[in-house]
Amino acid sequence: MVPQTETKAGAGFKAGVKDYRLTYYTPDYVVKDTDILAAFRMTPQPGVPAEECGAAVAAESSTGTWTTVWTDGLTSLDRYKGRCYDIEPVPGEDNQYIAYVAYPIDLFEEGSVTNLFTSIVGNVFGFKALRALRLEDLRIPPAYVKTFSGPPHGIQVERDKINKYGRGLLGCTIKPKLGLSAKNYGRAVYECLRGGLDFTKDDENVNSQPFMRWRDRFLFCAEAIYKAQAETGEVKGHYLNATAGTSEEMIKRAVCAKEFGVPIIMHDYLTGGFTANTSLSNYCRDHGLLLHIHRAMHAVIDRQRNHGIHFRVLAKALRMSGGDHLHSGTVVGKLEGEREVTLGFVDLMRDNYIEKDRSRGIYFTQDWCSMAGVMPVASGGIHVWHMPALVEIFGDDACLQFGGGTLGHPWGNAPGAVANRVALEACTQARNEGRDLAREGGDVIRSACKWSPELAAACEVWKEIKVEFDTIDKL
């Protein structure tokens, strides 16, 4: 037998309570390439040292508990314990610290986001010695990344499937989100797609309600897709929300979508759960379906600056769990999102290798080992006047979704879609010609209005609409 390595917690067992920092605060620790690293924003209770809080976070999210236990001597804590290896004060904040914790890779089940989160963001967030705790970032080492399949297809395969290159994709969430019959819903989908959109979308809370059962919606939306494709010669899609009360029902809906021949389905990954999401992602990969991911419930988790989980962590988790699209905020619309922070996690969704950059909130260098990227989706309170900023911010590999900004057009859904398509192509062309959309975007839109009455009408309706509030979660 291999002799056990004694640790301070296991040497000469003596019942009682010890400071966490005696075992779990190790400022001399050298981080391993295989360690999973976490950056926590801590707010200790008055009188509690930051080192004790950091050690408590490391302990309670790995091998530790509130008292010494004799079974510590039956394993090697040096091998399995989490370690708080650095603490730094948060500039400009009283009594807030960033605690860096390293976790041995063997603490986590391969390919399981559920197990990863159960440990790292589990009971420790209710720990009394902490007034507040927020997980700001994770470093997922290549050795652990390779245990995940990631997105079903990824950005490049999606473009190949729908045969669309050189510009962002256009979408629209059908409104009103609740209350339409399946046939009227399908009619709205058809009008938007024939007008020039690439995709339309179920809202996140459209599942299978009495006014519109899921199978009826799937059928009429599939009919709308085929009709619009025949008229336009373009590949079209509608994000059919397969989210359901059970995983079995969710897969049944995905099977139906596949049988109807539609290209893409949808899941609410936070309310549905990581286990269900990974199962659905695996089905989509095996059966050629794209998977659009909505982040409903995210703001409950990520919006407060000092407690919860930052969205960059939730975005990394989705990339591992699996999804081809993910809602990521707009910067310019009605939903929360600071520019540099948003661009930081958009890069974490799309790119293979992202350097540490604290100016964008990225605490660790992340290597995705060629895992397929996730296309960011900008949605929420945007309209044609926002198009130059959206193209400048997100580039081509993004889906820009205008719900009210399409369906609110004074002439109807199809003209609303035309207006958005014209605006997108005008801004893309202007950017490709070297024009500065940040400065000249308004001129680009006004020029395009001269040969698109649909765009001119949209610009007149929304010329005074702005959503300007301070961002709560700032760097």
UniProtKB/Swiss-Prot annotation:
Binding site for substrate: 123, 173, 177, 295, 327, 379
UniProt KW keywords: Acetylation, Calvin cycle, Carbon dioxide fixation, Chloroplast, Lyase, Magnesium, Metal-binding, Methylation, Monooxygenase, Oxidoreductase, Photorespiration, Photosynthesis, Plastid
Positions carrying N-acetylproline: 3
Cofactor descriptive note: Binds 1 Mg(2+) ion per subunit.
Residue numbers bearing the N6-carboxylysine modification: 201
Chain positions listed as propeptide in the UniProt record: 1-2
GO MF terms held by the record: magnesium ion binding; monooxygenase activity; ribulose-bisphosphate carboxylase activity
Gene3D superfamilies with a match to the protein in the record: Ribulose bisphosphate carboxylase, large subunit, C-terminal domain, RuBisCO large subunit, N-terminal domain
GO annotation (BP), single: photorespiration
Keyword Flavoprotein attributed: no
Catalyzed reaction equations: 2 (2R)-3-phosphoglycerate + 2 H(+) = D-ribulose 1,5-bisphosphate + CO2 + H2O; D-ribulose 1,5-bisphosphate + O2 = 2-phosphoglycolate + (2R)-3-phosphoglycerate + 2 H(+)
Main location: plastid
GO cellular component term of the entry, any: chloroplast
TM helices/strands, residue ranges: none
Miscellaneous note of the record: The basic functional RuBisCO is composed of a large chain homodimer in a 'head-to-tail' conformation. In form I RuBisCO this homodimer is arranged in a barrel-like tetramer with the small subunits forming a tetrameric 'cap' on each end of the 'barrel'.
Role played: RuBisCO catalyzes two reactions: the carboxylation of D-ribulose 1,5-bisphosphate, the primary event in carbon dioxide fixation, as well as the oxidative fragmentation of the pentose substrate in the photorespiration process. Both reactions occur simultaneously and in competition at the same active site.
Assembly with partners or alone: Heterohexadecamer of 8 large chains and 8 small chains.
This protein's name: Ribulose bisphosphate carboxylase large chain
Organism listed in the record: Chlamydomonas moewusii
